[in-house]
Amino acid sequence: MGCNKKALGALIGSVFMAGATQVLAGSSASMMANTCAGCHGTNGQSAGPASPNLAGVSESYFNDSMKAFKEGTRPATIMDRIAKGYSDEQIETMATFFAGQPVHKAMVPHDAAKAKAGAETYDKSCAKCHDEGGSLPGDDAGILAGQWLPWLEYSMADFKAGNREMPKKMAKQVEKLSDAEIE
C-alpha cells in the first residue's frame, strides 16, 4: 500500500492550518484591543488625561459607547470616525477583552480638598448608579474611580451641555450640578 504524497501533504497542511487558526483565534481579542493602545494604552490602561481607561469597563458599556460613536450620537474628536472602521463582531471582541482586564487607576495628583468635594458630589448625585465608589467593573454605568480628571471633566461638560445622551435619571442629577461640582 503506497503513500499518496498529495494526500499526505494535504493532511500535514490542514493540521498546520488548524494550529495556525487556533493561534490567531486566541490572539484576535488582544490584537483587536491593541488597535486602541495608541490613545487608551496597553490593555486599556490609558497613559494620558484626554483618553479614558478602558480596562474593566463592562461589555455592554463598551458596546453602547462604540455604537454611539458609530452613529454620531456621542461627541468625539476622532472616535466617531475610528468606530466606523470596526464591525459589530470586532467591537464585541474588544468589549470582551477590555471587560476582562483589571481596572487601572490613572496617576493623578492628590488634592485633599478636591477629593473631599468630589466624594460629596459622588455620594449626592452618582452613587446610586455608579456603585462602589464608581469603581465596580461590571457596572453598566461606566467606571468613574481612577479615570483621568480632565477626561471626567470633558465628559461631564458634554453631559451638562446636552451634547451627550444619558439616562433620564442621570440627566436629572447632572442638571443640578454646578460647574464647581463638575470640576
Pin down the residues of each PLM region.
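Interdomain hinge/lid region at the active-site interface
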Residues: M166
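Gly/Gly-Pro-rich "capping" loops immediately C-terminal to redox-active cysteine motifs
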Residues: G44-P75, D80-Y86, A119, D131-K160
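Sequence/structural segment immediately N-terminal to covalent heme-attachment motifs in c-type
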Residues: L24-N43, A106, H110-G133, W148-P150, ...
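Cleavable N-terminal signal peptides
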Residues: I12-G13, V23-L24
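Bacterial N-terminal signal peptides that target proteins for export
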Residues: G2-L11
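Extracytoplasmic/secreted proteins, especially bacterial periplasmic and envelope-associated proteins
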Residues: M31, T35, Y61-D64, I78-R81, ...
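C-terminal capping alpha-helices of c-type cytochrome domains
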Residues: K84-A106, P150, Q173-E183
